Structures are given as structure tokens and as C-alpha cells.
């Protein structure tokens, strides 16, 4: 996960002190290397045990139990990451989630490991949310706010 975290940080030109929030963060495997390097991390996941593990592994991280569909855009973070779009139930769900992610982000969003079939709906959803700078690198989609 270290290489992926470094790749995302480099692609988005972010460094220590940046606030990175992950949707469906699980135990925080993606966020852990960022936390170790001085990033402020947080996330949301529906699995309470996974969130307990994330809190134990990353003291000071801001984690909460909840579904991605309940993501609150009122609390801003610099970067919002999602690695779970392969499990998205529909394009409407994707559109709503991307809109909330984009509204929550102050710098960028990163959609990681996106299946090919979801590229077009995601790019459309990101454009609807207001992004004008979208970068696609293989299975990853980045959008600046």
C-alpha cells in the first residue's frame, strides 16, 4: 500500500500536513503510510471493527463508522480518496458519491482501481460536479477541485 499512497501523493502534489480522507477506508491500510509521514488522515467505513483498528493504528486520525452514501460534504478535507468503486451498486450511486466527494474536497479527489466499465460514468459524474481538470492514469482517476 506504501507505493500506492506515494503514487497518489506524488500525482496530486501533496505532502506532510495535507488532510487526506478515505471513503470506505476499512482498517486504514492506504492511509497508514501517509499517517506515518505526517499527513492528517481520516476516513469512513461501515465496519465498526475496521474503524476501531484504524483508530488504534493511527492515533489522532479522524475515523467514523458510516456508509459511503452518508459522506458529509460539510466537513472539508484537502483530498478525498475512494478505492471501493468496483463494488458500487449503480451509476446513480456513483454520481451521488462523486458529487459528495467533490463537495468535501478542497484540493482534489482520487478514484483508485476503477474498473474500465466505470471510467465513462465517473468522468461524467466528475464533470457534473464541476471539475475541469481530470487526469486518467490506467485504473486511477484524479480530479482537481
Predicted features and spans:
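A conserved beta-strand element that flanks and buttresses the S-adenosyl-L-methionine
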Residues: 81
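Conserved beta-strand signature within the Rossmann-like core of class I S-adenosyl-L-methionine
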Residues: 106-114
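Conserved SAM/SAH-binding beta-strand->alpha-helix loop
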Residues: 47
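Conserved alpha-helix/loop element of class I SAM-dependent methyltransferases that forms part
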Residues: 1-16
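Conserved SAM-binding loop
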Residues: 54
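Conserved SAM-binding strand-loop segment of SAM-dependent methyltransferases
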Residues: 59-69
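A short, conserved alpha-helix within the catalytic core of class I
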Residues: 88-100
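Conserved SAM-binding loop of SAM-dependent methyltransferases across substrates and taxa
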Residues: 27-37
Amino acid at each position: 500500500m506504501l507505493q500506492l499512497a506515494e503514487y497518489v501523493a506524488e500525482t496530486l502534489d501533496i505532502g506532510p500536513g495535507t488532510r487526506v480522507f478515505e471513503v470506505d477506508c476499512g482498517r486504514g491500510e492506504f492511509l497508514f503510510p501517509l499517517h506515518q509521514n505526517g499527513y492528517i488522515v481520516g476516513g469512513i467505513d461501515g465496519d465498526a471493527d475496521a474503524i476501531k483498528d484504524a483508530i488504534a493504528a493511527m492515533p489522532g486520525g479522524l475515523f467514523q463508522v458510516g456508509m459511503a452514501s452518508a459522506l458529509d460534504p460539510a466537513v472539508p478535507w484537502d483530498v478525498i480518496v475512494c478505492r471501493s468503486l468496483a463494488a458500487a451498486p449503480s451509476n446513480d450511486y456513483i454520481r451521488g458519491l462523486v458529487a459528495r466527494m467533490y463537495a468535501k474536497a478542497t484540493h482534489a479527489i482520487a478514484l483508485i482501481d476503477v474498473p474500465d466499465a466505470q471510467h465513462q460514468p465517473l468522468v461524467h459524474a466528475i464533470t457534473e460536479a464541476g471539475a475541469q481538470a481530470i487526469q486518467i492514469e490506467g485504473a486511477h482517476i484524479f480530479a482537481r477541485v
